[in-house]
């Protein structure tokens, strides 16, 4: 048991930061960086797509739903593979692995955010839209100033669940050897070749603590925010 803990403590810096001191972040730090980067892209992207789907009917909405269902129906690991091979062809050069995975996570998550935000908008009383229009608001002002803030607050638990899944999905970066937490845990296990249970139990505990922390932060934010 003590020896298993020694494996963790001896490699703790590498598991937490990777080689950040030499400009190559890894481990927990890189997992958080990829999750944060993907969230920064996916959240506003998903909101914009949801607003377009809510505002416009017909071909625009059908095209957005088709795109979202296509993305959600494909395993994320395939999206990562596609990005890994297609982005260099599109950009004419190799991209950093962490950036490629971040873009894949953002693309995948934006579709889920779109559906969640759209559900929140559709759940609001329809009379609010007519009431805002009668007060002189335009359709765009009504959506952005009246409906969207309420919808986002109402779907906060859903968004938290989405971003918890996003954080856990960063572990799939191991498939293209991006040195996030799961990858470096595997590297440590391959190097020491003993106590794999201790290494991967530690990895699981770290993911659990990160996800619980995110959930608690969201709860605290929801409690302290004034009601709309």
Task: Show where each model-derived region lies.
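Transmembrane alpha-helices and adjacent helix-loop boundaries
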Residues: 1-228
